[in-house]
UniProtKB/Swiss-Prot annotation:
GO molecular function: RNA binding; structural constituent of ribosome
Gene: RPS5
UniProt lineage: Eukaryota, Metazoa, Cnidaria, Hydrozoa, Hydroidolina
GO terms of biological process kind: translation
Organism: Podocoryna carnea (Hydrozoan)
GO cellular component: small ribosomal subunit
Protein known as: Small ribosomal subunit protein uS7
Signal sequence coordinates: none
Listed PANTHER family: RIBOSOMAL PROTEIN S7
Similarity comment text for this entry: Belongs to the universal ribosomal protein uS7 family.
Keyword field: Ribonucleoprotein, Ribosomal protein
Alphabetical list of Gene3D superfamilies matching this protein: Ribosomal protein S7 domain
SUPFAM superfamilies in the record: Ribosomal protein S7
One Pfam family it belongs to: Ribosomal_S7
Record InterPro entries: Ribosomal_uS7, Ribosomal_uS7_CS, Ribosomal_uS7_dom, Ribosomal_uS7_dom_sf, Ribosomal_uS7_euk/arc
Amino acid sequence: MEESWGEPGETVEEPTSIEVQDIKLFGKWPLEGLNISDISLTDYIAVKDNHAVYLPHTAARYAVKRFRKAQCPIVERLTNSLMMHGRNNGKKLMAVRIVRHSFEIMHLLTGENPLQLVCEAISNSGPREDSTRIGRAGTVRRQAVDVAPLRRVNQAIWLLCTGAREASFRNIKSIAECLADELINAARGSSNSYAIKKKDELERVAKSNR
């Protein structure tokens, strides 16, 4: 026996409004209201709504085309940079776990959104000026040059992860704790941060080679 699905002339009303759920990183940290202090880096620190993810593991092919990695969510770039040195290659889940634990520690210590601290740390850690080698074989000199915004973001992420990795080596503190300390110190502009010290050193060398 066939079931009747209403009268022939009857129309079914569709729901007019659909609630859009906010996407929060790890189900906790929202991307709304994040402020990037350095206006030149706003296009290269991917924290806008179209870059919102639940986990920093999009598995997209950002290396296929030049400059496409600027579209990668900034927390995923931080996670990928933790997978350095051969023994850590490919251990993405371990890196995601480290970032999640460090975000929890940062929130406990500061009471702020960890994503805002990451944005501030990257803005403060990217060197604005660097020096490059100019000249042919025999006569080589160093010349100060301005650093592109994407290069600043790349270098800041690398310095932050390197500082956390070196601080945790032969240390009772876990790498999640060291990463949280490094990000907080860099966001505050403290000289206790490895990334801030290296950035100041690079800018000092560039200034002497102007």
